Structures are given as structure tokens and as C-alpha cells.
Amino acid sequence: MRGLTLSRPLSLDEHVYGLGEKAFDLDRRRGFFQLWNVDVGYVSRYGWYVDPMYVSVPFFMVFDTKNAVGYFVNSASRIFVDVGLFRYDRLTVFVPEESVELFVIGGPGIGDVLRRYFRLTGMPFLLPEWALGYQISRYSYYPQDRVLEVVKRHLDMGIPVSAVYLDIDYMDGYRVFTWDPQRFPRPGELAEKLHEMGVRLVTILNPVLRVDQRYPLFGEALGLLVETEKGEIYTGTMWPGKSAWIDFLKPEARRWWSGRVRDWAERWGVDGIWLDMNEPAVLGEPQRDCTIDPGALHEVGGRRVRHAEAHNYYSVFQAEATFRGLVEAGREPFVLSRAGSAGIQRYAAVWTADNAPSWDDLRLQTALVLGLSVSGVPYAGLDIGAFAGHRHYRSPHLNDLDLLVRYYQIALFFPIFRAHRAPDTPDREIYELPDRWREKALRVVRLRYRFLPYLSALVLEAHEEGRPLLRPLACYHQDDENVHAMYDEYYVGPYILYAPLLGREDRRPVYLPRGRWADFWSGRTYEGPIWIENADELPIYVKEGALIPLSAEGGLDFLLFGAGGRMKLRDGTVAEHRDGGLVLTSPKHINEVIRLGERVERIRVGASTDRVI
């Protein structure tokens, strides 16, 4: 096989993070990986150690207790990476190209490497505040009246909802940018009523057009489609039947798609776009990984490029065009993409896609989202409750409500907080649950909203400074060998350590690294490094020096533990804890100041102020 081999020594005390969505331990040592985006459900069986998956990022870092170095291979081809599996003392990258850009990114810290990677490939987009809330979805909510009923039932029971998603069944014959006239006879009215309830509308789009002369968009897009080596339109099977793929590598095609997204959002009140099947997936082509023929042709800068050389960046270019269309429509752009690669962070969030409910999967989802975060994909989530039903995997856990609640709990701080399920699964909206499990799930959702000001501030930090929301413990404790492979607890921003429960038991060991910590619930303090046992089903620990804004009725609460905390809020206000008091650069309505210590002290303010002593 022709190509380039890049290799470097790998010592026993070095660890490796990155490579995107990998069903593997957070530390990639002793793994062999392909970077090639696929629709996992059609190529293999979703689960631990399945490779490849939906999001392939040709970026990784090698670190020890003192130093970290990053490597970015600027290629969209099928890359193979051996992280000390076949040769214990070598890390080897094979790229099937005769030349490639390789960027070496200095540290010395893990966070330093990440920030420089973002400066190289693009800073994360500013995720809208509403996109941090609870999003509800199903394959599929229809007809139109049912969508409104589902949202209303949530709100009537005091369950906050920020957005509702429409899957492919809203379309007319699965043609993008159309509405099924029977199921959705008044789509503009749908968005209007949702907006009156304070809920956004997100619709799914696929990267294909039905090959049909009666479908106006197919005629418009002639000359903008992926072609065969003979210069004919490349066709295959997708949801509409015989389909053609838009060539998103072609600037004219991206401009055309942006225009369609703009018109769609403006005309129908759509707030966000959900991109699916954009690995790109082709149904019924297992011999080609269920994707476009590697010999099919794209147009890049006036030259023809084989799909094999462009594959992993296809979704990034689609996300860019979608993002720009929403901007043109005057929206705060929100795009959720199934596939991605280097640069996806500039335009879209991702989710881990078609998982099946199981206790093993619960652990896997935590590893996947944290692994994406340290691969330069800071906005990620999962299908809360798990997607797949009987048709996919015949999971014995479909009706396990304890497991369902655990999915909500692990997702508490995930940047994307969305419930989604397959059509052959039982209804699992929170209001459908028996009392015990409903209260547990609702507790998570309400706590999520309590932390929204903090999460929103972390989004601003990601956008401006290149710091992901979720951070492995090694980001702050690189010299602590205990944490290098740890994925079942992590930092949320600089001040919170979260150790979600990943089994049926309500207790687990929690490692608190060096420093002073306080239990979020009781205020009890600990001096790390120390192993403890959690006291609550949501094990949250606050680091000394914390300043955490929390939502409160009509304003904010501020949680403080020790002095020295600083946080820039979403509106640009800087809050600092200094000289024994809380100081803000602009007045805010502060409900309470909560001080953690051996007990929880609450100071009632209830006024607009820029200083609390």
C-alpha cells in the first residue's frame, strides 16, 4: 500500500489522548485505530472496542507527568494509528497519501496543547444558551399536534424543555426541505406555538437529494453533486430511495445549501439543524463500509479529488454550510452533527449516536464524550436513555428504569443534554415514568438548569480561550499517575469534579486529587489526594477557590469555596471573589451567596448589586 508512515518512540510512562470518537479507554495506549467515519449500526455492532465510529479526528497528544506534545495530521483519508499495540515501544501512523501536513504542537501541559490545537484548526463556535437546556427528541414525533402535546405535557408537569426535534418522518417522502402535508399541514404555526411556550424547533437534514425530475431541488443542484469517475451523477440508496449526494467540498454547493437552510429557517421558524447520515452513509453497501465509493469524485479548488481522500472532512464542510445558512437567517446558529473530524468544533456539536441500552454502554458513553472533549470536540452528548430498540440489538435492558435514570445522571454536565429513542422503543418521556423514577430524572433536569449559568460561562471560555467544558483529571493533575486513564470522573470547568454512578449501586469510590474539596450537597471538606465514598446519587465536589454562578429566581446565586475564584459570565460580566467579598464588573440581581465549608452558609442578598461582602 502506497503512503507515508510516521513513527515515534513510546515510553512506558507515556499516555495518549485523542483521535476522536473511540470506543476505547481514555488512554489510547495498546490500541489500534482507523480514522474513517462510518455509520456504526450498519457496519458493525455498537459497543466497546468497535472501531471505527462516526467522528474521526487526526489529532492526538502524548504526555507524561511533566510534558505533553500534540500531533495533528491534516488528512481526510483512512488513517491507521498503532498506539503501542503491535510494537510496544512505538506509536505509528500510516497515511495513504504521498505527502501530508503534520503539525507538532508543544505543551508542556495537556491544556496548553488543546488551546494551541484550537488556534490551529479553529475555536469552538459559541453554543447558544438555549442549546444547553433539556432537548427532547424521538424517531419520530408526529403528527404536528402530537409534537405540541408532548411539549405541553412536559411543561405542565414542571419539566423544563429548551428544544424539540423532528426526525425524518416530518418530510414528504424523506425529501430534504419538505414537509409531509398530512402529518405537518401547518408547519409555520407549529414553530409559532412552540416559540410561545419558550421552546425551539430543530429539524433533521440528510446530505442527499432524491433523484427525481419532479423534485425541484434535484434540478437546482445539478452540477453540485458528487460524480462518478465517468462524470455521471453518483447515486446510491438512502431514505428517499435512489439518491444523489451533495458535493459539500465544492464552494458553489456549500453556498447553495446555505441558501436552502436560510430559506428553511426564515420561512418556517426553524431554530437549529440536526445533520444525520453524513459520514456519509449509503444504505446497502457493506462492501464499502456503507459509504460513498472511494473512487467517486469531488471538486476542490477546480481539481477533482477522489472520495477516499476527502471522506472524513465531508461532514465538516456540510456543517459549515449549514452553520452559515442559520447565520444568514439571523439565528444563533445551532448545528448537531453525527459525523465530524478536525474543524467540526467551529460549526457543530456532535452526539455519540445509535447506542443500545446496557450497563456496559453507560460506561462507554462517559468514555466517548470525555474522549471527544480531549480530541478537540468540546460540545458532545449522547441519546439519553439510549437509542436502539428491539430491531437493532434486542437489548434486554429496554425496560430497566434504573438504567434509564443513570443515563440522565451521567449526562448531567454533558454539553448536549438530549433524550432520543428509536421508533421500536417504549415511551420514556419523564412524565411517562412511575413516580420514583420520574422524580429521580426530574431532579437531574432541574439541577441541570440550576447549573446553566456556569455551563454557559464555560461555553464562552471554550469559544474565547479554547478550553473544553469537560476535562480529564490529568488536565490539572498531570503529575498524578492515578488519573491518566480515569474516565469515570472528570472536571466540569475548573471548579467542579463529577463522579457519576455507572452501576446499579448507589455508592462508589471517588478519587479526589491533590487540593481541598467540598461536597456540593453537605459542604463537608476533604484534603486530597484521598479516596472517599460518595454520599449522594449525584456525586459533585467543588474545588477550593471556586466561584460558581447558579440560576435563581429572577437572578443568580453564587457558590463560593475559599478565596480567589474568578468567572467571566456569558454577558461579559467578570465575577471575582477577593478581599473577603464577591465583586462584579457590572451589577447583577444576586439572590444568595452560598459559602461551602464544614457547613453550607447562605447569605441572602435579593438585590441588584456589584459587591457582596
Describe the residue ranges of each PLM region.
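Catalytic and substrate-binding clefts that recognize carbohydrates or anionic sugar/phosphate headgroups
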Residues: 1-128, 138-139, 144, 151-156, ...
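Glycine-rich, histidine-containing beta strand-loop boundary motifs that form or position
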Residues: 8, 61-63, 72-75, 83, ...
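Short alpha-helical segments and helix-capping/turn motifs at coil-helix boundaries
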Residues: 38-47, 52-62, 118, 147-151, ...
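Extracellular structured ligand-interaction cores
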Residues: 54-58, 66-68, 76, 97-99, ...
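N-terminal small/glycine-rich loop or linker at the start of catalytic domains
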Residues: 123-137, 232-245
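Aromatic- and carboxylate-enriched substrate-binding clefts and catalytic-loop regions
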Residues: 160-441, 476-477
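Catalytic core of carbohydrate-active enzymes
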Residues: 323-333, 340-351, 361, 372-382, ...
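A short amphipathic beta-strand at an alpha->beta junction
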Residues: 600-612
